[in-house]
């Protein structure tokens, strides 16, 4: 049965959308008016490399069995949807029209699957060790999440690396690392049934007889998506330096021993919260994947471009580590550098200052 899925965020969201469309489900992308008009006219293109193929293939939404449309936040009719995907960067949810839509989503009690790096606050409330911690400081505006029931919000580890090529239109996405979305289960079994249905449908898709990478994998453990934290703190946030941004590869491989110590420390924090070592990704596997990540992280690129706010998983992990009594000088240093770079932009003239 075709499901109808609403995804907030048309850039990274178009990757999950394409996988759902290939499996015969219908998707609405929520974005700016100009981008919505472009997508409604031309569809989306996601470039992905299949196993054993040398070049990326363009997968066009208009050629897929599911139907795609795009709309602005104000025009969403929530009664049409079975599931909401959260694919915007965390600071974007503070936009007024998005906030209004988020209030409606919370009131409609629709299950929400996040593919953000920054875990939604209600998701963290599902983890007993975090439920009473003071973590609001890490969010641009924590009030956005106040109305959501924790059991209705789950998180995917957004491992696939993808970016919008700067020379292309806003409906094109290039997938650099086609790994899987690893989702934790919802609290409600009916919602998990839907999630596992989508997992199976995506898994069954082939293209010219070839398997298509980037699957949706569902896990019972709430801690599987937290494996991403070790990667973000070791690579993505350390792309932000006091000077120019560096690539993820250089951040990780510049001092492999230091990188492993940071990675292991964050893994240790997740285990203190209740994660099983099986929920985690070995450092060696991550370091190998990082060899092919030749660009700075999206966070580093955003800071370099003058963004006044970015997702702050670095600060979130710092707050948790201090409240657990397990701080790390290296993590604290990373947070300090990110704060310093963001403050430079604000002092230089706020949003958009170069």
Language-model features and meaning:
Residues 267-354:
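C-terminal active-site/capping subdomain that shapes the small-molecule cofactor and substrate pocket
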Residues 75-120:
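Rossmann-fold NAD(P) dinucleotide-binding segment
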Residues 21-22, 106, 271:
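Anion (oxyanion) recognition and catalysis
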Residues 34, 96, 189, 193, ...:
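Conserved active-site and cofactor/substrate-binding residues in soluble primary-metabolism enzymes
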Residues 1-50, 121-122, 354:
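NAD(P)+-binding Rossmann beta1-loop-alpha1 motif at the extreme N-terminus of oxidoreductases
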Residues 179-302:
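C-terminal substrate-binding/catalytic lobe of Rossmann-fold NAD(P)-dependent dehydrogenases
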Residues 31-81, 102:
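Conserved N-terminal Rossmann-fold NAD(P) cofactor-binding segment
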Residues 79, 113-230, 234-235:
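Rossmann-fold dinucleotide-binding core
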């Amino acid at each position: 049965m075709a499901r109808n899925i609403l995804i907030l965020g048309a850039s990274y969201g178009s990757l999950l959308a394409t996988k759902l469309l290939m499996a015969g489900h219908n998707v609405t992308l929520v974005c700016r008016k100009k981008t919505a008009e472009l997508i409604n006219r031309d569809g989306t293109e996601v470039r992905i490399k299949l196993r054993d193929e040398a070049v990326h293939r363009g997968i066009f939404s208009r050629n897929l069995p599911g139907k795609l449309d795009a709309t602005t936040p104000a025009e969403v009719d929530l009664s049409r949807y079975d599931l909401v995907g959260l694919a915007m960067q965390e600071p974007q949810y503070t936009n007024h029209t998005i906030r209004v839509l988020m209030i409606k989503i919370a009131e409609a009690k629709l299950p929400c699957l996040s593919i953000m790096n920054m875990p939604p606050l209600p998701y963290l409330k599902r983890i007993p060790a975090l439920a009473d911690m003071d973590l609001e400081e890490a969010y641009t505006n924590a009030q956005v999440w106040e109305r959501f029931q924790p059991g209705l919000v789950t998180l995917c580890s957004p491992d696939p690396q993808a970016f919008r090529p700067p020379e292309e239109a806003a409906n094109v996405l290039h997938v650099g690392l086609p790994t899987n979305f690893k989702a934790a289960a919802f609290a409600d079994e009916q919602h998990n049934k839907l999630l596992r249905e989508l997992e199976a449908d995506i898994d069954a898709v082939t293209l010219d007889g070839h398997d298509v990478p980037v699957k949706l994998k569902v896990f019972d453990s709430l801690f599987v998506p937290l494996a991403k934290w070790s990667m973000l703190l070791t690579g993505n946030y350390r792309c932000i330096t006091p000077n120019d941004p560096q690539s993820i590869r250089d951040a990780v491989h510049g001092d492999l021993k230091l990188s492993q110590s940071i990675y292991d420390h964050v893994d240790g924090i997740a285990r203190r919260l209740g994660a099983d070592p099986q929920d985690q990704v070995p450092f060696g596997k991550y370091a190998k994947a990082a060899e092919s990540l030749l660009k700075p992280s999206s966070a580093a690129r955003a800071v370099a471009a003058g963004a006044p706010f970015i997702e702050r998983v670095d600060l979130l992990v710092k707050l948790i580590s201090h409240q657990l009594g397990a701080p790390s000088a290296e993590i604290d240093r990373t947070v300090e550098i990110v704060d310093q770079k963001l403050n430079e932009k604000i002092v230089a003239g706020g949003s958009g200052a170069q």
